Amino acid sequence: MPSLDSLNCRRSLEVNGKTYHYYSLPEAAKQLGDISRLPTSLKVLLENLLRWEDNVTVRADDFSSLAVWLKTHTSEREIQYRPARVLMQDFTGVPAVVDLTAMRDAVSRAGADPQRINPLSPVDLVIDHSVMVDRFGSDQAFEQNVEIEMQRNGERYEFLRWGQQAFDNFRVVPPGTGICHQVNLEYLGQVVWTKEENGETIAYPDTLVGTDSHTTMINGLGVLGWGVGGIEAEAAMLGQPVSMLIPEVIGMRLTGKLNEGVTATDLVLTVTQMLRKHGVVGKFVEFFGPGLDHLPLADRATIGNMAPEYGATCGFFPVDQVTIDYLRLTGRDPDRIALVEAYSKAQGMWRDSQSPDPVFTATLELDLSQVQPSLAGPKRPQDRVSLGDIGASFDLLLDTSGKTQQADTAVPVAGETFKLKHGAVVIAAITSCTNTSNPNVLMAAGLVAKKALERGLKRAPWVKSSLAPGSKVVTDYLERAGLTTYLDQLGFNLVGYGCTTCIGNSGPLPDAISQAITDNDLIVSSVLSGNRNFEGRVHPLVKANWLASPPLVVAFALAGTTRINMDKEPLGYDEQNQPVYLKDIWPSSAEVNEAVSRIDGQMFRTRYADVFSGDQHWQSIAVTAGDTYKWNNNSSYVQNPPFFEDIGQPPAPPKDVENARILALFGDSITTDHISPAGNIKASSPAGLYLQQLGVQPEDFNSYGSRRGNHEVMMRGTFANIRIKNEMLGGEEGGYTLHQPSGERMSIYDAAMRYQAEGVPLVVVAGKEYGTGSSRDWAAKGTNLLGVKAVIAESFERIHRSNLIGMGVLALQFVGDQNRQSLGLTGNEKLSIRGLSADIKPRQLLTVDVERADGTRENFQVLCRIDTLNEVQYFKAGGILHYVLRQLIEG
């Protein structure tokens, strides 16, 4: 629907002989006042509001609020934002399509047309989360892993093939193609989007939300995008605006340029550490300053990618000549490139050396020349460690873990016996869109491999090594540069095009290695070029996980240990028994640039010409056409969820929660991995026992992430991470709790089901940063299905808070300095939440009454983190999807 355009700012633009219509920010400024120094990211929001003005969801005073932001640098204004498109990966995409399919069933039951459930915005789903590193270290590894992937995921892929034909505006990028964020960066992202409206072509900024927290990678291209839960993304697909507060924007001024030998990975780990320390949760970060002139777009994308790790909603880079050069490099359409430049300049969104610095809420500064070679670990991405300090950092981990320094064990590998010690690198993975989208660090890794082999070095035999790039272009350019053979010889053979180790799909370790780790309680390491290293994520047996650049991943595979100072100690010895140091095999910038210069646009155009076609495996999947899906009750992967069974009944008004029990008591930094793990399913876990009852053998369990289309598996997997610690059981790891008042120890799932049978509502209590990590909607869905009415925490990560509200679960925040410890909560109390009613307001204070086991009573206040009026509506309806579905049924 055309905008009301109350500011009369619609104008036209001629580019290469074609006329485009757009909503002009300079014209709007004639009534709003000078907005030239508004952060570019907020200019994108302002254009969105101008284009969607309807006097219902978007009003003229919304524009004024953004203009006033220039004076106040902050705002309490809620706006309704409509992104141009939605991006999904298959772990989050399958449950979203399951929900849409179940909504069609609900609409059909209500006597309406199921075609009412269709994406209104373009949706791209990239299958990248399912491939595992089952085979490695051989030329056959890729084909073998593809075969195994297709066998494991046949039910899921058949369902997605059905969805591809059943839903409009819905495209699927088949498995074995790449990682969604890299495909988005190299192909899907347009920077400026166009659509036909009443016979005219409208141009506007390319914007998106994605069902993966690292959607922010596209910010490096000047495209505003961030991760949301699958729940919120589904609502956006169906025409619901994204409700948000106008954010604070933190400016990060970059000066200087990176020194010789310093990589984009070193830079992003430094940025992550700085911004986490400053505190940017729920805020935009925008990069500016003369340092951008020396920062390639691939480096910008790496920084944008890790916005979830530094806590920001996004990490945005404005469009400039570097953007245009990248669009040309990746083979984009010349007319689109011309439009991007002309539109950005016409809108005052173009950056160059003459651009005035924007006004920000606060500003940080980083001199790029001060960045040092770094890793991050062993448990958090923000814990940066200088390369020379990693050995000391690991020894500190040993000391705090109470381990003996010299523990080791003999391990037979490939016919030889080796000593496996604390700190041994058992996984070295060149993985993840974060770094494999960056030709500079990929070429550097290949050059390190080449130089290492020339000096006679080999990969340590206990290291499981792998190469899993985010697009097929990567293997093309490594091959063209003549570097593939060297990576292969060191065991970094191609294992797949997908997320693999970065998301926990590292596959099994060799039996002898696993046995040695388990029998001797060894703390061993993984080194990966990924973006997350939370406990239990990479591999359940690997407790120390280090994020590093691809060339450093190769170096640690050579050294075989993280108990090393690579600045001073050799990686190994050559055939003359001379020490070989990292500096001896590290490539110069000139060598890297020479290799990168071989990349051209035709490589990208060729690979992306048939990106939606898939291989013979994909094309051979048979599907039955139809508007509604024929559910298979015997499927262990895809089941009709229970979320919409009561949609025919009016929602009950909010009411107080009476005499709830505490299901679990957690500490700080409980991640969505802790709440809803994506990796291995333990045979003895509730989910494992359920699958075995269906006749699924443990070797065929696949992963939690692959089974998100089956609510029975996922609710059993909620709070089932093997590294989660419920304080009700002291320091014990695993998804267990104490049932109250019996005090009986049992799995969290079994306790929740017992409480449901007893008619007892539940709450979860936690510390700071609850729900950090992936945009995992099942972390909220599973919480809901366990019967949890509220989560009370000291603070919430942005996406998970939104997801909880979207599933009808209260997110309640302790006030002031209060927390579970200051209030003496132990887990055996009864909690009642007072103040819930039909007239609940955003960010209202509620009262929690506490009844202790000895009968004593007290109370404390909490801040209800229903943050916006839209969220109030969603909560009253029982959740955002219930709200949208009722609207669609009612027409």
Give the ranges of each region predicted by the language model:
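Acidic/polar, glycine-rich intrinsically disordered N-terminal extensions of enzymes
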Residues: 1-82, 618-619, 626, 630, ...
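Long, structured ligand/cofactor-binding scaffold of large enzymes
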Residues: 54-257, 264-269, 373-376, 390, ...
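Terminal amphipathic helices with adjacent charged low-complexity linkers/tails
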Residues: 82, 100-156, 286-287, 292-404, ...
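Mobile "lid/hinge" segments at catalytic clefts and subdomain interfaces of large enzymes
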Residues: 197-351, 443-461, 493-607, 805-810, ...
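Extracellular/luminal Protease-associated
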Residues: 288-295, 531, 752-753, 757-797
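Acidic, glycine-rich flexible loop/linker segments
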Residues: 574-589, 801-874
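Segments forming glycine/polar-rich beta-alpha architectures that bind adenosine-containing cofactors
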Residues: 624-700
